[in-house]
UniProtKB/Swiss-Prot annotation:
It holds the Pfam family PsaL. Keywords: Membrane, Photosynthesis, Photosystem I, Thylakoid, Transmembrane, Transmembrane helix. One of its GO terms (cellular component) is plasma membrane-derived thylakoid membrane. HAMAP family: PSI_PsaL. The keyword Amino-acid biosynthesis does not apply. Disulfide bonds: none annotated. It is a multi-pass membrane protein. GO terms for biological process: photosynthesis. The lineage of its organism: Bacteria, Bacillati, Cyanobacteriota, Cyanophyceae, Synechococcales. The gene is psaL. This is Photosystem I reaction center subunit XI. The chain crosses the membrane at residues 108-128, 165-185. Its main location: membrane. Belongs to the PsaL family. It is found in: Cellular thylakoid membrane.
């Protein structure tokens, strides 16, 4: 407990409430089944990290801990490669179908170039995050992620993650571009393009 927290708890310990404002008909044990849904602090309540039914539930913990950023047993470079591939693959569709060249014959290539440009911008932001004086912030364990990866939150780990993200993002965009350019999708491409066409 920090000095501020000690002084705060000491200053509030002498607070007495007027008896007419205290409801004695409800006791903590009266809550019953709803007690399992109560919000509890994970560690320090002043940090604001609370264990709620959403962030500490089984499905949420299983989903978040299986994402490449938090999965155990993989290197920072592979974390970046997998995350970047997902970003590149998923960003290609919106850039292709809603971009300014969506009704031209260059829509697929323009979407590819726009996606690679967005991956470059995100990579530059990751590099800038690692550039200032101190190393990246190490995430403490919380209600959702019990064991965050220690090797990722170092300068070398973050640099490996960034290079993997760039390679995976460009590769994911190229894979989506090749997939959309195949012949079996030619019959549905006009339908998809007409969904977002304004006039």
């Amino acid at each position: 407990m920090s000095d501020f927290q000690k002084s705060f708890s000491e200053s509030t310990s002498s607070i007495k409430f007027d008896e007419k404002y205290i409801d004695t008909s409800v006791q903590p044990n009266d809550i019953g089944v709803a007690e399992q849904w109560a919000v509890k602090t994970v560690a320090d309540p002043c940090v604001g990290n609370l264990a709620t039914p959403v962030n500490s539930g089984y499905f949420t913990k299983a989903f978040i801990n299986n994402l490449p950023f938090y999965r155990e047993g993989i290197s920072p470079n592979f974390r970046g490669l997998e995350t970047g591939a997902a970003f590149g693959y998923l960003l290609y569709g919106p850039f292709t179908m809603t971009g300014p060249l969506r009704n031209s014959e260059f829509a697929l290539t323009a979407g590819l170039l726009a996606t690679i440009g967005a991956v470059h911008i995100l990579t530059a932001l990751f590099v800038l995050y690692n550039a200032p004086g101190k190393a990246p912030n190490v995430q403490p364990p919380d209600a959702t992620v019990n064991n965050p990866p220690k090797d990722l939150f170092t300068r070398a780990g973050w640099a490996d993650f960034t290079s993997g993200f760039w390679l995976g993002g460009c590769g994911g965009a190229v894979f989506a571009w090749l997939l959309v350019g195949t012949l079996h999708l030619d019959s549905i491409m006009p339908i998809i393009k007409n969904i977002w066409t304004a006039g």
